[in-house]
UniProtKB/Swiss-Prot annotation:
It is a multi-pass membrane protein. The chain crosses the membrane at residues 32-52, 64-84, 94-114, 123-143. Pfam families: DUF3792. The keyword Membrane applies. It comes from Bacillus subtilis (strain 168). Keywords: Cell membrane, Membrane, Transmembrane, Transmembrane helix. This is Uncharacterized membrane protein YrzE. InterPro entries: DUF3792_TM. The gene is yrzE. One of its GO terms (cellular component) is plasma membrane. It is found in: Cell membrane.
Length: 150
């Protein structure tokens, strides 16, 4: 029995854009997490190696300053590279978010643990970390082999 007012099946206003945004957000978050894990793993291994060298030899800590700085920058480049590779798009942004997350973790550790904020020298280092990690993210996105060309 038809009364003239047939109800049409209403399509939801959402056409799948929210699912796409959620998937992209998961991808970015996953990339940042993998990048941070890589950074902290590399720094942990470096700390272990340097501490073993300091205890086993007569070397002093000051002789490792430049090596530790170079390895720190390399670690952040690798972390940005991994985060950009996992994120698959916008490597500069994912690299920047990875570096900012790293800097925030270090700042929180330093402030909550020691009651100190960043010095001017540390701030310059963390700005350098930001640039290097962004560069790593750009390379990470562009080195992925399974991208399709249009």
């Amino acid at each position: 029995m038809s009364d003239g007012f047939e109800q049409k099946e209403q399509k939801p206003f959402n056409t799948g854009r929210e699912e796409t945004i959620m998937e992209e957000t998961k991808q970015v978050g996953k990339g940042i997490l993998y990048g941070l894990i890589a950074i902290f793993s590399a720094m942990l291994l470096t700390s272990l190696a340097v501490s073993l060298l300091l205890t086993a030899t007569s070397l002093e800590e000051s002789s490792f300053n430049w090596l530790i700085t170079a390895i720190s920058f390399l670690s952040l480049f690798i972390g940005g590279f991994i985060s950009g590779g996992k994120g698959k798009e916008r490597g500069w942004m994912i690299g920047a978010l990875t570096a900012l997350s790293f800097s925030l973790i270090i700042l929180l550790f330093q402030y909550l643990g020691f009651g100190k904020t960043f010095t001017a020298e540390q701030l310059i280092f963390h700005l350098g970390f930001l640039g290097v990690c962004m560069l790593g993210g750009i390379f990470g996105v562009n080195m992925r082999g399974n991208r399709s060309s249009t």
